[in-house]
Amino acid sequence: MKNKKMLKIGMCVGILGLSITSLVTFTGGALQVEAKEKTGQVKHKNQATHKEFSQLEKKFDARLGVYAIDTGTNQTIAYRPNERFAFASTYKALAAGVLLQQNSTKKLDEVITYTKEDLVDYSPVTEKHVDTGMTLGEIAEAAVRYSDNTAGNILFHKIGGPKGYEKALRKMGDRVTMSDRFETELNEAIPGDIRDTSTAKAIARNLKDFTVGNALPHQKRNILTEWMKGNATGDKLIRAGVPTDWVDADKSGAGSYGTRNDIAIVWPPNRSPIIIAILSSKDEKEATYDNQLIKEAAEVVIDAIK
């Protein structure tokens, strides 16, 4: 009798084990199929966007670098993601992030004085306050919101210069960005010159770290994104390429050789934000940049991620 009970128990255990094995095998197989399907979908989307970005390059006679991250799904859209471009004034948003990283919010109330000799071309805010100075927070906001070049230089000085900026990014894992000069020389954008350059992928990752990652605490992230939401120079760029009910916070940049850039974090309704970096350049030094190129590239990104 005892042997019969043991036999029944053994049979039950065996059947249960077989069922679990079958379930695991089925579940594992299903997950593998699902993963392959998702990988295939992402690959298909990148192939489709690759063609569209290539067509934009031909249309505008320009070179594009694009990297976008859907922070909710980790889906990425990439085109020439590792090619170097002059970062131009996009650095101001990231340098402001470094400033916030290295200083308390109380430090933003400190008044910074400067002279007329410190002013450089395109300083619409700082040129009005030479006599009184500005708080560090006001200077950072002027750099990010109005792309004020003197404010950008003061930001650099407060974080150890261009090399201090580069060093801060290295600590965050960026092994790509090269920062060498102050405004306005950093906008020369000479083809083949790696000074003051980065890639769409590196910039997008840095922006993600500062705005939704762990590089800054919540309060400081909010300060940075509020400055970027008020950007006065981005209406015709990524902001123009996203649906009107999306919230956009961006920082633009421009330089010689038709350099036109925009980096942004955008919030679709009821979804996690999307990080977008779009960089562009042309072959001729005096070439005119195209805002429309950035707008249309942003539209390609949004259509692919929707």
Swiss-Prot record:
UniProt EC number: 3.5.2.6
An example molecular function term from Gene Ontology annotations: beta-lactamase activity
Keywords on record: Antibiotic resistance, Hydrolase, Secreted, Signal
Major localization class: secreted
Keyword Iron applies: no
Localization, UniProt: Secreted
Residues forming the catalytic site: 89 (acyl-ester intermediate), 185 (proton acceptor)
Function: Acts preferentially on penicillins.
Note: The class A beta-lactamase family has a specific amino-acid numbering system, sometimes called Ambler or ABL numbering and often misspelt as Amber. A multiple sequence alignment was used to derive a consensus sequence and then the consensus was numbered taking into account insertions and deletions. This allows use of identical numbers, e.g. for active site residues, despite differences in protein length. UniProt always uses natural numbering of residues, hence there appear to be differences in numbering between this entry and some papers.
Protein name: Beta-lactamase 1
Taxonomic source organism: Bacillus cereus
